[in-house]
Amino acid sequence: MKEEKRGSRFLLIISVFIIFYIILSSSFYFGFINAYIVAGALFLTLMISWIFLFRYRHTKGKFGKVSLIVLLVGILFIFDFFLLQFEQMKYRTLIHEEPVQAAGNSGIHLMSVGTAYFSHAESKEWLIKNFERGGQDFFQIEEVDNKTRYHSRNDVFLQLVGIRNDEVSVMAKNVRSYLGEETAGVEQFLESEDISGDSAGLGLALTGLIEQNKLMNNLDFGVTGALSEQGEVSGIGMIKEKLMIAEKERYPFMIIPSENAQEARQVKEAESLEIQLFAVSHIDEAVRLINRLNAEAEV
């Protein structure tokens, strides 16, 4: 009877803590509290748990149950401790990044949008003035809320424990698998530390084909799109910003994923862009397109 009562009490304590944690996490997610309060509350709970663990260190049954509670609280404390690194982020800015060619004058320009976080900016208007004063092009400035911090923490944690591979690693694996062999320009690009996301996959694979002398190109193309190992092209984010960059660079052509075609056409019409858009769902379509446009240019 006593064992059943102790077991019920243990389950009650666990249930109360889980409810407490759900309320704590929800309060953070919806912006009622900050990461310091979350970490502080869990740290205090962990210290109290350690006190009970020390108290019952010679009581076999209770020691085991309290140890489980300490372990649970400790894991959640470590998990939520990652929130602190995002707490200082106040604003996120999407900025214009110069397109790059991974290999010489391949004509394949890899499109990317820079992301910068600011922790000490006085206000959104202050940031805008400083960007304009410095002549830096930017697309938008948005305030970082707790929902963004929460999801960013989850992504970082999953990558650290190996549950989710980061997009750059997946892109590198897919490009290398598709090409079948390493090429100097592609490898140099993949080894750089300032790349993020997987939207350069299609452009890198096309660059690799040029380096392998399997594709000839004398035109300028803005290229964006994720790539699978089999050469399928999938959608990417920030298509509007990438189109605006390509237009500013005066590229005549832009190759985009078919999944982004509708949005891209809407952006082109709304912004009165002159660039010609070509949507592809497989890299083979991009290769045929490049061959055709080069042949037409020679006539």
What are these regions (language model features)?
Residues K2-V299:
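Peripheral, non-AAA+ core regions of ATP-driven protein-machinery
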